[in-house]
Amino acid sequence: MKSILLILILSAFSILPSWGQSGKLFNTDNQLSSNLATQVFQDRSGFIWIATRNGLNAYDGYHISIMKKELANSQGLNSNYINCITQDDKGHIILGTNNSLLAFTGSEFRKIPMLDPKGKELTTYVTQVYRLRNKDIAVGTSGYGILLKKPDIQECHAMKGDVEKLKHIHKLLEDKQGRLWIITEDGRLHRKETNGKITSRFHGTEGLTIQDIQQDDFGNFYLATKDKGVYVFKNGSNVFTRIPNIGNLPIDNIYISRNNLLYIGSDGMGVCVYDPKTGIVQDNPLFSRLVNLAKSKITSIIEDNRGNIWVSMLQKGVFMQGNAQNDFNYMGFRLGNRNVIGENSITSLCVNQGDQVWVG
């Protein structure tokens, strides 16, 4: 039995490369305004923006600047509860809060009125701000559907057509064909076709509670579910099929890196990485000496323009893992359910005549 255990350890060493150094953690002990981070975003100039439930944070590579409504540098900011971030075609940072839509010009925050069909201003929880290919900003709301902000108009109006019947929006994705995929708060998947019609039935999604959707460079779609793992809709296929290797993680969000690795953020079980080419899944390859990332609630994942991976978390702040890797491999708690040696300190190693490794 011990021999089997040690073989498993050696096998894990051989197939699970790790980053060569611990990353950097930002929290309330290290510059961040709140540990309740809801999204991390990089703008076109390379600045990292971090939305939290107690203020907005901007990182220039050396220092974080905090913006809160009670501070002098935050003129016009009407809420510290920031849900989501994007950037418009003019370079303004667009923010969705728990009650408003804002644009940060670099010197002040400007409220963007959200109007109902009768022209009455709405106060609503903004779930996502998403830049479309035509430069419009699609605004997902909890209760009033999808609103649109045109580039030269300083207000939002409801997206017209059949899509108006969808009121509680969770996630949006515009695909390479110009279709808009919509996940509603009840976990249902819909698609606004280019002719404005809504498709709401997709083979393979029956009974799923859907959390996120992404498309890779090859036209394949990946669908994240709450408790049944990840499904893939391959280019040219007509059905979503489950990826068995990933398992039934409680997934909140997914992200596809530039080299087409699928980063999977879960609710309480950290990050795992799936390689579609090999089918290999790495459980919690990111490492911090300060917190156990394998037990984190992940709210967003991005890759910055230097290849660093950023992860926002509820209760633990934001973590950045540099892209430098080496051939040194790891076994320990951050491998999640592939860890076979526990979380205790290692005090000794011994190799016997049969090339078995004993771990003490």
Regions found by a protein language model. Name each.
Residues M1-G360:
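Carboxylate-rich, polar loop motifs that coordinate divalent cations or form catalytic acidic clusters
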